[in-house]
Amino acid sequence: MTDDTAAPPPRGPARDWKSSPLVSGLLLGLFSLVSALMLALASDATRGPIAARSAEDLLASLAQVLPETLHDNDPTADIRTLSDADEGAVRVYVAARGGAVTAVTFELTGYGYGGAIRVLMAVAADGTILGARVLSHTETPGLGDKIEIGKDDWIEGFAGRSLTDPGPAGWKVRRDGGVFDQFSGATITPRAVVGTIHRGLTLFDRHRAELLAPLPPRS
């Protein structure tokens, strides 16, 4: 005879639903989704201001090397991309008056003592340099940084130069037999800039017909 009043067998400990692997996975997925959405919203919020700042910086840089009197168009809107065997793809900002190209501006990179040196240069239709500026570099402060217009006027010495002025042998620093000054204690840096600007002139010369082709009329 069974005793109906006997206690039921003991049960295992109650399982907390929060510790379930399925719930943990769902919570982790939800957290990741919320984080991704927040990052996307933050990216969208900053993309506009960053793009606007980049456009302002570009216009300011162009204004330093490209006289406003040479164009009635917006060079940042009239862009040609060169495909060059030596330099690769080069983005070119075209200045024009009445559709006739008066000058082009582009950026090339050279390598100095501290690393990459980004140089922006404007070249007139006749092949003479209108101006050049160093956009960024990591050269030694107090020595190589004289390539900056804010530190020295050395970079302004390229205005008016061309492939024939001073000629192939002259496109070097004085220590190498050329006409351009080097800096005391720093020869590698100016040598790199001179070489980069000379490369820019030869690039222009190779693609002269393409670069100086009239702009299509605006609709």
From Swiss-Prot:
InterPro entries: FMN-bd, Ion_transpt_RnfG/RsxG. The modification FMN phosphoryl threonine is found at residue 187. GO terms for cellular component: plasma membrane; plasma membrane-derived chromatophore membrane. Its main location: membrane. Signal peptide: none annotated. Its cofactor is FMN. The chain crosses the membrane at residues 25-45. It is found in: Cellular chromatophore membrane. It is a single-pass membrane protein. Disulfide bonds: none annotated. GO terms for biological process: electron transport chain; nitrogen fixation. The complex is composed of six subunits: RnfA, RnfB, RnfC, RnfD, RnfE and RnfG. PANTHER family: ION-TRANSLOCATING OXIDOREDUCTASE COMPLEX SUBUNIT G. Belongs to the RnfG family. This is Ion-translocating oxidoreductase complex subunit G. It comes from Cereibacter sphaeroides (strain ATCC 17023 / DSM 158 / JCM 6121 / CCUG 31486 / LMG 2827 / NBRC 12203 / NCIMB 8253 / ATH 2.4.1.) (Rhodobacter sphaeroides). The lineage of its organism: Bacteria, Pseudomonadati, Pseudomonadota, Alphaproteobacteria, Rhodobacterales. The gene is rnfG.
